[in-house]
Amino acid sequence: MRVNSLTPQDLKAYGINDVQDIVYNPSYDLLYQEELDPTLEGYERGVLTNLGAVAVDTGIFTGRSPKDKYIVRDDTTRDTLWWSDKGKGKNDNKPLSQETWQHLKGLVTQQLSGKRLFIVDAFCGANADTRLSVRFITEVAWQAHFVKNMFIRPADEELVDFKPDFIVMNGAKCTNPQWKEQGLNSENFVAFNLTERIQLIGGTWYGGEMKKGMFSVMNYLLPLKGIASMHCSANVGEKGDVAVFFGLSGTGKTTLSTDPKRRLIGDDEHGWDDDGVFNFEGGCYAKTIKLSKEAEPEIYNAIRRDALLENVTVREDGSIDFDDGSKTENTRVSYPIYHIDNIVKPVSKAGHATKVIFLTADAFGVLPPVSRLTADQTQYHFLSGFTAKLAGTERGVTEPTPTFSACFGAAFLSLHPTQYAEVLVKRMQASGAQAYLVNTGWNGTGKRISIKDTRAIIDAILNGSLDNAETFNLPMFDLAIPTELPGVETRILDPRNTYASPEQWQEKATALAKLFVENFEKYTDTPAGEALVSAGPKL
């Protein structure tokens, strides 16, 4: 569909001049033809796989580049944003001057000028009251395909008078030669101006920068209105019971929320307002490393025509080697949410959550597969956001390393973590929600806890059997662990049983507990933070 009201003249308002042609909100069929155009070269060109989906490579950037993220510091953001150069917290919100912003904007608009452009107008947020109308501008067909998959696709009538609240200009082919003089990290940049309401991308082809860029914007706007903004997946049961799954990349958000017994609300980004939980997105972005049809049939079956694979190895016959992580461990597929059969329709939203699940992938092998949290422990573990950072989701990470990421998504937080915790706690108190800590990582055997066991644990949480189970407390961490659960090997519920001796667990537990305590020190400068210390590990 082409909307005649959008012309090259309109783009001059953004500083983009002499545009050859505008491909506006292209259909999937057109994008398919464009991506497979044999005259394309380099990272623009897609490859057809035997599953019907197109596969692309994103170059040296196979994950986000958090060190290249900047936000203009001005009157809008000076006193509200959680800046990287203020306080003890660690984040990626590096300040950018107005002067450098203008320079970067000039580079991107110059790159996009004189080109044939793809423009996708879409929504971020399933609630009409708080959604963002976003306009994506790119010269690369598959990047247009990515945002068409990942954001909410407007109906034709919604495009007639579409007025963007935010503009994303993707100039992946341009870099910044003056980065050193400007005090920046590299020639690549992902920059935001919350006053002009524009995101600029230069140097990186990775599609996830557009997805997570808008998540950072929602993370700024919504909590200031008292709405929880969450890095989580969500689903709903037959009785309308809603569960949310917090977790960093690779901990199981997409896998565990994609459940044939429950309808999917969304797999990564949600809000929680007075009406309930709602998706920000219109698609899913699943990791595909070691994907198998047997273990994850819903995700495997979603990989078909209109899905877009990233950085997978495609054999000469078009078949995909999902086990090959030679390009990156962070191989991905994006697909429109309706590629999953069991979803909430017609709008990706449901009622208030009653189960809140924190997913962690513990590389130390210390934490139990599941524990039930008290109210204070809920806040403590939400602010701690512990996991092992898994290989490949960020540039330069190849081995699992322990990490603490506030609210299970520090990279995307625009405000101080305590603001997200306050809003979440209010929502949980109002709905009577219970929180759980689920370890999808490793145990003392050195093996990862199986998807089968984790799914049985999630079932026990959702059907209430965990709440009715007898529990005992794990020393040092004071976590309440069930003595037995249906379908779960009883021996693994106590992590100490997976070690050759209790002393081995004690040694590793002490090391991990020290990391928790050190990390939480940054929150002890307020009475509320100090009061939560007792909910953490005790040495």
From Swiss-Prot:
It comes from the Bacteria. Pfam families: PEPCK_ATP. Its main location: cytoplasm. SUPFAM superfamilies: PEP carboxykinase N-terminal domain (SSF68923), PEP carboxykinase-like (SSF53795). GO terms for biological process: gluconeogenesis. Keywords: ATP-binding, Cytoplasm, Decarboxylase, Gluconeogenesis, Lyase, Manganese, Metal-binding, Nucleotide-binding. Mn(2+) binds at residues 212, 231, 268. It is an enzyme of class 4 (lyase). ATP binds at residues 212, 231, 247-255, 296, 332, 448-449, 454. This is Phosphoenolpyruvate carboxykinase (ATP).
